[in-house]
Swiss-Prot record:
Tissue: Root nodules, stem and flower.
Biased composition (Basic residues): 82-93
Induction: By soluble compounds from rhizobium (in cells through which the infection thread is migrating and also in cells that do not yet contain an infection thread).
Subcellular location: Secreted, Cell wall
Entry protein name: Early nodulin-12A
Signal sequence coordinates: 1-24
Sequence repeat ranges per the UniProt record: 34-38, 39-43, 44-48, 49-53, 54-58, 59-63, 64-68, 69-73, 74-78, 79-83, 84-88
InterPro entries the record matches: Proline-rich_CW_protein
Known function: Involved in the infection process during the plant-rhizobium interaction.
Biased composition (Basic and acidic residues): 45-81, 101-110
Amino acid sequence: MASFFLSSLVLFLAALILVPQGLAQYHLNPVYEPPVNGPPVNKPPQKETPVHKPPQKETPVHKPPQKEPPRHKPPQKEPPRHKPPHKKSHLHVTKPSYGKHPTEEHNIHF
């Protein structure tokens, strides 16, 4: 009988330690605790007003014009061209145009 009493006492003490609220507040009505945070309020999203920023212009940098250095190119020698001498004929006869009578200067049929 002593072992039963001892085991029930250990069980009762273990229940008191393990249950965080304990048995004293079991029969009491729950106490109202207000919420830490307020109720959610539906607010329309606030749009930030656009800030007008003028475009930033880069300051012009003055660079003096740079001339390219002269390039040395060797002179190109063209091979000599051998053309036969052009012989002009003494009688230069031109053909009359089609459908026209030859003028007296070009008429060689006297």
